[in-house]
């Protein structure tokens, strides 16, 4: 697999459909860097409550289908990454009420022991 290319100047690149500079990478790599897709998808990305996650995932999947009709591989892959990232975060909220995997109170108590 070709790794995601972090050396590109993402602040100044506006990717186009099927842009040859785009690399899939592994999992969620580069999900917040690839503009304009990140900006377009991110405004619909919610996961804190069950209802938010359902609405968000349906909207992003609809965007995926729109990109598919346009044969826009970059848009499709970015939607996939956001859905994957949302699934991971939603699972975290399901397992931890505040979404944190570490109790900061516990860490502070532990730090004072040293």
Q: What residues fall within each predicted segment?
A:
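Short, charge-rich, low-complexity alpha-helical interaction segments
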Residues: 4-47
């Amino acid at each position: 697999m070709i790794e995601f290319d972090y050396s590109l100047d993402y602040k100044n690149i506006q990717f186009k459909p099927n842009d040859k500079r785009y690399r899939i990478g592994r999992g969620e790599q580069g999900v917040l860097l690839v503009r304009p897709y990140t900006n377009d998808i991110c405004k619909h990305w919610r996961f804190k409550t069950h209802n938010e996650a359902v609405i968000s995932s349906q909207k992003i999947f609809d965007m995926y289908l729109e990109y598919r009709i346009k044969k826009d591989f970059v848009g499709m892959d970015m939607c996939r990454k956001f859905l994957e990232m949302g699934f991971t975060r939603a699972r975290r909220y399901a397992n931890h009420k505040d979404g944190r995997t570490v109790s900061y109170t516990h860490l502070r108590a532990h730090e004072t022991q040293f």
